[in-house]
Amino acid sequence: MGSFASRADLKAIEAEAAWEDRDLPRSMYAFLSRTKDAHGARPALSYQLLSTPGSKSETLTWSDLHGRVTQAANLFRSLGVGEDDVVAYVMPNTVETAVT
Protein backbone atom coordinates (compact mmCIF):
# COMPACT_ATOMS: atom_id res chain seq x y z
CA MET A 1 0.00 0.00 0.00
CA GLY A 2 1.49 3.35 -1.00
CA SER A 3 -0.89 5.95 0.38
CA PHE A 4 -3.68 6.23 2.86
CA ALA A 5 -6.89 8.15 3.31
CA SER A 6 -8.31 6.67 6.48
CA ARG A 7 -7.29 5.28 9.84
CA ALA A 8 -7.91 1.76 8.49
CA ASP A 9 -5.45 2.43 5.64
CA LEU A 10 -2.87 3.59 8.18
CA LYS A 11 -3.36 0.43 10.25
CA ALA A 12 -2.92 -1.69 7.10
CA ILE A 13 0.36 0.07 6.26
CA GLU A 14 1.63 -0.36 9.81
CA ALA A 15 0.73 -4.08 9.71
CA GLU A 16 2.86 -4.68 6.58
CA ALA A 17 6.16 -4.45 8.46
CA ALA A 18 7.61 -2.95 11.62
CA TRP A 19 9.07 0.51 11.03
CA GLU A 20 12.55 -0.65 12.08
CA ASP A 21 12.40 -3.43 9.43
CA ARG A 22 11.68 -1.03 6.58
CA ASP A 23 14.40 0.34 4.34
CA LEU A 24 13.89 3.92 5.50
CA PRO A 25 16.60 6.59 5.66
CA ARG A 26 17.75 7.25 9.23
CA SER A 27 18.07 11.02 8.75
CA MET A 28 16.84 13.81 6.52
CA TYR A 29 20.31 14.02 4.97
CA ALA A 30 20.21 10.29 4.20
CA PHE A 31 16.80 10.81 2.57
CA LEU A 32 18.17 13.66 0.44
CA SER A 33 21.22 11.60 -0.55
CA ARG A 34 19.10 8.62 -1.56
CA THR A 35 16.67 10.80 -3.51
CA LYS A 36 19.53 12.65 -5.23
CA ASP A 37 21.03 9.34 -6.32
CA ALA A 38 17.70 8.13 -7.70
CA HIS A 39 16.31 11.37 -9.18
CA GLY A 40 19.19 13.88 -9.30
CA ALA A 41 18.06 15.82 -12.36
CA ARG A 42 14.36 15.92 -11.45
CA PRO A 43 12.80 18.99 -9.80
CA ALA A 44 12.86 18.98 -6.00
CA LEU A 45 11.32 22.39 -5.32
CA SER A 46 10.36 25.54 -7.15
CA TYR A 47 10.04 29.01 -5.74
CA GLN A 48 9.41 32.54 -6.91
CA LEU A 49 11.20 35.30 -5.03
CA LEU A 50 9.08 38.17 -6.33
CA SER A 51 5.45 38.31 -7.34
CA THR A 52 5.83 41.06 -9.89
CA PRO A 53 4.81 40.69 -13.53
CA GLY A 54 7.53 38.90 -15.42
CA SER A 55 9.14 37.43 -12.31
CA LYS A 56 10.31 33.93 -13.03
CA SER A 57 10.38 30.98 -10.72
CA GLU A 58 13.56 29.13 -9.87
CA THR A 59 13.68 25.35 -9.65
CA LEU A 60 16.20 23.29 -7.72
CA THR A 61 16.82 19.71 -8.77
CA TRP A 62 17.44 17.04 -6.15
CA SER A 63 21.17 17.36 -6.92
CA ASP A 64 21.01 21.15 -6.45
CA LEU A 65 19.09 20.83 -3.19
CA HIS A 66 21.49 18.18 -1.87
CA GLY A 67 24.45 20.41 -2.75
CA ARG A 68 23.01 23.43 -0.95
CA VAL A 69 22.08 21.38 2.11
CA THR A 70 25.63 20.01 2.17
CA GLN A 71 26.99 23.57 1.99
CA ALA A 72 24.84 24.59 4.96
CA ALA A 73 25.94 21.50 6.91
CA ASN A 74 29.59 22.29 6.18
CA LEU A 75 29.07 25.86 7.38
CA PHE A 76 27.55 24.69 10.66
CA ARG A 77 30.37 22.17 11.11
CA SER A 78 32.99 24.89 10.49
CA LEU A 79 31.32 26.96 13.21
CA GLY A 80 31.77 24.11 15.68
CA VAL A 81 28.31 22.56 15.51
CA GLY A 82 28.58 18.81 16.12
CA GLU A 83 26.37 15.78 15.53
CA ASP A 84 24.72 15.96 18.94
CA ASP A 85 24.16 19.73 18.88
CA VAL A 86 20.82 21.34 18.13
CA VAL A 87 20.46 24.40 15.90
CA ALA A 88 17.30 26.49 15.87
CA TYR A 89 16.55 29.32 13.49
CA VAL A 90 13.67 31.56 12.51
CA MET A 91 13.51 32.43 8.84
CA PRO A 92 10.87 33.59 6.38
CA ASN A 93 9.33 31.19 3.89
CA THR A 94 12.16 31.25 1.33
CA VAL A 95 14.34 28.74 -0.47
CA GLU A 96 17.09 29.45 2.06
CA THR A 97 14.80 28.06 4.74
CA ALA A 98 14.42 24.82 2.80
CA VAL A 99 18.15 24.26 2.39
CA THR A 100 19.22 25.24 5.90
PLM segments and residue spans:
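Short, structured coil/loop segments at alpha-helix boundaries
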Residues: 6-7, 94
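Short, contiguous pre-domain boundary segments
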Residues: 8-18
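A short N-terminal helical cap/helix-turn-helix that marks the beginning
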Residues: 2-5, 22-48, 67
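Acyl-group handling in specialized metabolite and lipid biosynthesis
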Residues: 16-24, 52-58
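Conserved AMP-binding/adenylate-forming core of the ANL superfamily
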Residues: 41-100
